[in-house]
């Protein structure tokens, strides 16, 4: 059974669910999921899991993300991006490069961010975007996010400065809305702002260099095999034959070298355990002097398919 990750370069106009549906047909299985939604207008890295690899997705969702984006200052939209109608316009002619830099700096580091109201966040069981589209005014609670990097690459004045386009790179924690960053930068400058372009270039350890378009995947389905996917995602632990046998049957073994330290493997941040053959056997968490399996992938005594890239 084919199992592994597929790194897709999502096309503009497709929902993440659309891409999952396409991959189900390409892989010949219903068991396909993704590790974090991309808005339809956005392009770039969308990590999919096939069959057993869907169990890795929960550990990818919480990783940092990197984006390139264009923020338009001087116009506010109902969706905080170019998909929505412009609700307010103010001239950006007086906005200097230094003012943009100050605004960006204030939005870098740990911040409290109010998500865009047109989002998939549920309010009393209903998606926020559905409430907004029905005419309801939705106010979402702020949540903590971290903007690790917010770099300005270029500032372009259009129509004599009526609007200003700012090209940026953002590296951020999971749960950050780049649309909300655009909105907040515009609001801080007193002229409003929204997102006009967004491309995700990295999700955790998986980058755009590894991504393939749906057309390329239709010609050759390139799958990152489970062992390789886990090795790049989390700390590794190499097992002996005896340890492999114990873990394969759900039994505990001696804790890893990081036990009792901040580097200890936990259920939320486990270590990937590999048989001598290189096969991914399980994900482990250290509890006291023992390590126990959080997930077991491979039954048996340590023989396996090794590592490699399945196609």
Swiss-Prot record:
Keyword Signal found: no
Active site per database record: 39 (nucleophile)
Pfam families registered for this protein in UniProt: TruB_C, TruB_C_2, TruB_N
Keywords linked to the UniProt accession: Isomerase, tRNA processing
Sequence segments annotated as region (Disordered): 237-268
E.C. number: 5.4.99.25
Catalytically driven reaction(s): uridine(55) in tRNA = pseudouridine(55) in tRNA
Biased composition (Low complexity): 254-268
Residue ranges of the TM segments: none
Enzyme category, top tier: isomerase
Taxonomy, superkingdom: Bacteria
Any one biological process term the GO annotation gives: mRNA pseudouridine synthesis
Molecular function as annotated in GO: RNA binding; tRNA pseudouridine(55) synthase activity
InterPro entries in the cross-refs: PsdUridine_synth_cat_dom_sf, PsdUridine_synth_N, PUA-like_sf, PUA_sf, tRNA_psdUridine_synth_fam2_C, tRNA_psdUridine_synth_TruB, TruB_C
Function, as annotated: Responsible for synthesis of pseudouridine from uracil-55 in the psi GC loop of transfer RNAs.
Family: Belongs to the pseudouridine synthase TruB family. Type 1 subfamily.
Name of protein: tRNA pseudouridine synthase B
Native source species: Paenarthrobacter aurescens (strain TC1)
Lineage: Bacteria, Bacillati, Actinomycetota, Actinomycetes, Micrococcales
Gene name per UniProt: truB
């Amino acid at each position: 059974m084919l199992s592994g990750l597929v790194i897709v370069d999502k096309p503009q106009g497709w929902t993440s669910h659309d891409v999952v549906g396409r991959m189900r047909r390409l892989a010949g299985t219903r068991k396909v999921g993704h590790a974090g939604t991309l808005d339809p207008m956005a392009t770039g890295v969308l990590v999919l899991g096939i069959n057993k690899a869907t169990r890795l997705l929960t550990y990818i969702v919480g990783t940092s993300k990197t984006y390139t984006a264009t923020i338009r200052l001087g116009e506010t939209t109902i969706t905080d991006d170019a998909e929505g109608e412009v609700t307010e316009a103010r001239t950006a002619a007086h906005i200097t490069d230094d003012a943009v830099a100050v605004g960006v700096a204030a939005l870098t580091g740990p911040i409290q961010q109010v998500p865009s109201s047109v989002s998939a966040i549920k309010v009393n069981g209903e998606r926020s975007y559905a409430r907004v589209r029905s005419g309801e005014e939705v106010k979402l609670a702020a949540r903590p996010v971290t903007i690790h990097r917010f770099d300005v690459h270029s500032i372009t004045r259009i129509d004599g400065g009526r609007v200003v386009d700012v090209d940026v790179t953002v590296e951020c924690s999971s749960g950050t809305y780049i649309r909300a960053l655009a909105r907040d930068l515009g609001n801080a400058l007193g002229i409003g702002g929204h997102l006009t372009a967004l491309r995700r270039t990295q999700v955790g350890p998986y980058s755009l260099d590894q991504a393939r378009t749906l057309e390329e995947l239709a010609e050759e389905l390139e799958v990152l095999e489970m062992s390789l996917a886990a090795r790049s995602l989390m700390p590794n632990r190499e097992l002996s034959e005896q340890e492999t046998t114990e873990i394969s049957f759900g039994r505990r073994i001696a804790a890893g070298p990081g036990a009792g330290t901040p580097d200890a493997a936990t259920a939320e941040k486990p270590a990937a355990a590999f048989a001598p053959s290189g096969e991914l056997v399980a994900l482990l968490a250290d509890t006291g002097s023992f390590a126990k399996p959080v997930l077991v992938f491979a039954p048996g005594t340590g023989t396996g398919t090794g590592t490699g890239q399945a196609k």
